[in-house]
Amino acid sequence: MTNIRKQHPLAKMINHSFIDLPAPSNISSWWNFGSLLGLCLMIQIITGLFLAMHYTSDTSTAFSSVTHICRDVNYGWTIRYLHANGASMFFICLFMHIGRGLYYGSFTFLETWNIGVILLFTVMATAFMGYVLPWGQMSFWGATVITNLLSAIPYMGTGLVEWIWGGFSVDKATLTRFFAFHFILPFIIAALAMIHLLFLHETGSNNPSGISSDSDKIPFHPYYTIKDLLGVIFLLLCLFSLVLFSPDLLGDPDNFTPANPLNTPPHIKPEWYFLFAYAILRSIPNKLGGVLALVFSILILTLIPFLHTAKQRSMMFRPLSQCLYWMLVADLLTLTWIGGQPVENPFIAIGQTASIIYFLIILILMPLTNLLENKLLKW
């Protein structure tokens, strides 16, 4: 009798995606981050659901409802900090996942890559709206500053900002709609992730060498289920260490103060995972120019497949490209550091230099280096 997993329509679908899926035999631990992102999303949805049971999206009670969750709800503090630090873990995995895609040339799967970029934008929007919900000082002022950026759009900007706010400032209407969107978006992210996987399984996974692995495939289960399980253990270890030992390490002290529209914090900054984009935004003195640079700093990922001029797919055997890649990583870390610093010299100059280097590496140096390597390898 044929196994039920190969007969039942639903089980058959799961079987083809996670059990009998032919996978390259040489994929490294860098390929673990896809499953870890799925785990992070599940953690966020489950903890978020429990938080939503106790949270109130009203300006007068939002801050105290979060305090109530931490003090009075059974293990409320654990759920709250799992959710807050789970977002940080989500972004760490996301950046690693994108970094792996860039290094090993996974961006040549155009549909998978572009859905991934849409996913990145959606996750960033969700995280931003989630940061507003505790209604602390940084929540309020972060929401005010970031939504105000849309006023840079010519002609319709001001009207658009007031439409998003639901009034003439960030207030009850803004908080209520942000809560509604923050609740629904993770389910949209889950649907997009399924489309992402659907496109990936059309082509099959890439591998570190960047060459076709059709002649050497192994079943996903048990080899990669065990390998993914190791990644899951490491991720949970890091997450629980953060939650149980220093839950506020990645937060902002200003968010322990209830939102006050009459008192501006000395230094407004978003969560750490947005700091690189925030630094690029601040490095341009013009408001519209800054907003365009901010959007393009993420949107540039969609151009990477078209800027890929190398004959080899992966960077595994291309040392010059590897040097540029690690320079880009160092540049992004510099931008993250600068985004958290006050707007004064020398930070302004460093931020502007790092922003120029970021676009320079991706748009000019990478394609030229690829062409040079083709010449050196006589391709």
Curated annotation (Swiss-Prot):
Give me the comment on cofactor binding.
Binds 2 heme b groups non-covalently.
List ligand-binding residues for a ubiquinone. 201
Q: Which domain of life is it from?
A: Eukaryota
Q: Which residues cross the membrane?
A: 33-53, 77-98, 113-133, 178-198, 226-246, 288-308, 320-340, 347-367
**SUPFAM superfamilies the UniProt entry points to:** a domain/subunit of cytochrome bc1 complex (Ubiquinol-cytochrome c reductase), Transmembrane di-heme cytochromes
Name the coenzymes or cofactors required.
Answer: heme b
- One Pfam family of this protein, by short name? Cytochrom_B_C
GO MF annotations in UniProt: metal ion binding; ubiquinol-cytochrome-c reductase activity
The primary location reported for this protein is: mitochondrion
Specify the protein name. Cytochrome b
Gene encoding this chain? MT-CYB
